[in-house]
A protein has these predicted regions:
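Pyridoxal 5′-phosphate
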Residues: 6, 12-446
Length: 446
């Protein structure tokens, strides 16, 4: 199922759409940067570059300078552009004044690490060895509760962090087992609970009822973080129903090369940086130092990701100027079309549940053919870019493929993932379906 500035006469963060009306998808499509002959169906891994955004970045670079200085006009302008981008992003994402927005690293993984640093969960292997496992076991560790669809960046990092971890499994309907979740919360009611759930699977596109999860987590005074790396390319989440958000703007159209983003409730942050560096201090003498009281700057030590944040802002602005409703409508139509045609192919094993609200992301295998060989054939013979593997969601993959933990495999298990995007056309979908059928026939003859 699909869908149940002007500053001193200079434009700081310009609107991509001067007419103040929703952009036409056909016109947007013409400005995607993609080599002729390639068909891109890998948007869940990364978006593509967009020429008007690259043009705006080139304009901005004419007065570029590092931040953290009030003595030169270029530095002042760059600082204003940077902070303006942050402010606009908060608005584009629907964040209210109870949140900080921190730019970090290259994607959601960096946001996850920053969140764990702020919450005291992240610990380096060297620090762990220095403290010793025996001493660590004496600590009153928090319980981290995760969902069944989590990316390795969430699950593996928590396994290695200063916390105990509990994975909520799938129920008989292939969605989150809410009974198991509430029982886990009841059994650990006196503990410090930090929950992290993916808002949408990057494998099957299945959406999470994050409002329901939030209500359960808050019933037991827990904290809820949402991984929206997959979802936020298409829609926002209501800021009343989470405490932290992990975002990956590079997955948006035009977001290539942008930074990761962490939205986090102000009440969760301290007045000390997780890493003390240049840009986090107001004054440093030979014997002492004073940190800035601006928390967002505290967590962006050193040169901040200036171009990356501005690019992220432009990508989200493009998303909103296309229109979230228009995006949803296009993806519903194209997703339904692909799903119906895929189901007609007898050799295809489709792992995406039919009864759940989800994004048009498909994971499938072809009987008797390696997903890696199949994806390579689509690419080499038809120019179709998909992705084969487990999509950094191994535990969920074990559920989908009915695999036993720690089993020995002749080849790495996986599937072919296809991401249907609102920039695709019906002709693109037909081309993809015909290519899948053709590849199946060719492999059968071998």
């Amino acid at each position: 199922m699909f869908c149940k500035l002007f500053y001193e006469n200079l434009i700081i963060i310009p609107a991509l759409n001067k007419r103040k009306t929703l952009l036409n998808i056909d016109e947007v499509r013409k400005n995607i940067i993609l080599k002729e002959g390639l068909y891109y169906f890998d948007y869940t891994a990364s978006g593509l570059a967009y020429k008007p955004i690259e043009d705006e970045i080139l304009k901005f670079l004419k007065t570029y300078a590092n931040t953290h200085s009030d003595s030169s006009s270029s530095a002042v302008l760059t600082q204003k552009c940077y902070e303006n981008a942050r402010a606009e992003l908060k608005s584009l994402l629907g964040l209210d004044d109870s949140f900080y927005l921190i730019a970090t690293g290259q994607g959601a993984t960096a946001a996850i690490k920053k969140f764990q640093e702020i919450m005291g969960i992240y610990i380096s292997p060297a620090t762990r060895a220095l403290i010793g496992e025996a001493n660590l076991r004496k600590l009153n560790l928090p319980l981290a509760i995760i969902g069944p669809y989590e990316h390795h960046s969430v699950e593996v990092s928590l396994r290695e962090g200063l916390c105990d971890i509990k994975r909520i499994e799938l129920d008989e309907n292939n969605e989150i087992d809410y009974v198991m979740l509430e029982n886990t919360l009841k059994q650990n009611a006196k503990r410090n609970i930090i929950a992290s759930f993916s808002a949408a699977s990057n494998v099957t596109g299945v959406k999470t009822d994050y409002k329901k999860i939030y209500s359960l987590i808050k019933k037991y005074n827990g904290i809820l973080a949402l991984d929206v790396a997959t979802l936020s390319a298409y829609e926002n989440v209501d800021c009343r129903y989470f405490d932290a958000l992990f975002l990956s703007p590079h997955k948006l159209l035009g977001g290539v090369g942008s930074c990761g983003l962490l939205a986090i409730k102000k009440e969760l942050c301290k007045n000390l940086p997780t890493f003390a560096a240049g840009g986090t201090v107001k004054y440093v003498s030979r014997t002492s130092h004073v940190f800035t009281n601006k928390v967002e700057n505290l967590e962006e030590g050193g040169t901040p990701p200036i171009i990356q944040l501005i690019r992220a802002n432009l990508a989200y602005k493009l998303r909103n100027e296309i229109g979230l409703n228009k995006i949803k409508e296009a993806e519903c139509e194209l997703g339904e079309m692909f799903c119906k045609e895929l189901e007609k192919i007898d050799e295809v094993i489709n792992y995406c549940p039919e009864n759940l609200d989800r994004l048009p992301i498909f994971a499938f295998n072809v009987k008797g053919i390696s997903p890696y060989d199949f994806a390579a054939s689509l690419s080499s013979e038809f120019g179709i870019q998909t992705r084969a593997g487990c999509d950094c969601a191994g535990p969920y993959g074990h559920d989908l493929l009915n695999l036993k933990d720690n089993a020995i495999f002749e080849a790495k298990p996986g599937w072919v993932r296809v991401s249907i995007h609102y920039m695709h056309t019906k002709e693109d979908i037909k081309y993809l379906i015909n290519a899948i059928k053709s590849c199946i026939k060719k492999h059968k003859k071998r």
